[in-house]
Amino acid sequence: MTHFENASIQKTANVYFDGKCISHNLTLPDGSRKSVGVILPATLEFNTGAPEIMEVLAGQCRVTLADAPASQTYEAGQSFNVPGNSHFTIEVTDTLHYVCHFG
C-alpha cells in the first residue's frame, strides 16, 4: 500500500530526540492509528505502550528488541513487531522512512 485513503492527519509533527525522529499521526476511518515519519542517522531507544508493527519504507536499520539476545537488520519492504509495554533500540545510518502501525 503506497497511501492511506480518507485518513485524519494531525497537522503538528511529533518531534523526538532533538529532531532525530519526526512523524505525523493519522487515524483511519476504521479507528486504527498509525504514524508516518523519518528517523535521521542516530541510535535511539523507544518505549512502547501499545503493541507496534514498524514497517520500513526506505532505508535500513538495526533493531534490538527488549530482552533479545542480538540485533536484527531490517530494510525497505520489511517490518518488525514490538510488544506493548516494552522498548527497542534502533540504529539508523541513513535516513529511514517508516510507518508505525499501533495496536
UniProtKB/Swiss-Prot annotation:
Read off the InterPro entries from this record: Ppnp, RmlC-like_jellyroll, RmlC_Cupin_sf
Look up keyword Disulfide bond and say if it applies: no
Q: Gene3D superfamilies from the entry?
A: Jelly Rolls (2.60.120.10)
* Superkingdom of origin organism: Bacteria
Q: Please indicate if the UniProt record lists Metal-binding as a keyword.
A: no
A single Gene Ontology MF term assigned here is: uridine phosphorylase activity
- What are the UniProt keywords, alphabetically? Glycosyltransferase, Transferase
Report the EC number(s), separated by commas if there are several: 2.4.2.1, 2.4.2.2
Q: Which family does it belong to?
A: Belongs to the nucleoside phosphorylase PpnP family.
Q: What does this protein do?
A: Catalyzes the phosphorolysis of diverse nucleosides, yielding D-ribose 1-phosphate and the respective free bases. Can use uridine, adenosine, guanosine, cytidine, thymidine, inosine and xanthosine as substrates. Also catalyzes the reverse reactions.
Official protein name in the record: Pyrimidine/purine nucleoside phosphorylase
Q: Which organism is it from?
A: Laribacter hongkongensis (strain HLHK9)
Q: Which gene is this protein's source?
A: ppnP
